[in-house]
């Protein structure tokens, strides 16, 4: 297991799931929060994120497949998307990619989903498809 990113809300690891490369997202305990409140927040965010990722797929938007969710450990195993973060693109694909991101965000909003953290670090381009990742702060509107 290899740490890919240490975030404010969760740590992201490259691992494997049933013989495939996978992402493991772990929501770590926050020592500065009341333990009961911390547990509830991490558990609710894990459940909400996995549900929204699956729901958004039904709109025709590319998101990672969710393989497994452990609500007790506040962990989620997902498909590893090998590609480039949008923030790292520095070629003519940027305009096309930005237009596609606009369409994706419009589709999300039209279908009552607010991502909650739209940054170039939360989109991955693989071949000609734009994948949306990190629905940890997403909400249904």
Where are these regions (language model features)?
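Catalytic-loop of the protein kinase fold
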Residues: 110-120
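Conserved protein kinase catalytic/activation segment
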Residues: 122-132
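Activation of the activation-loop gatekeeper triad in protein kinase-fold domains
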Residues: 134-139
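Conserved hydrophobic "DFG−1" position in protein kinase catalytic cores
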Residues: 14-17, 68, 80, 125
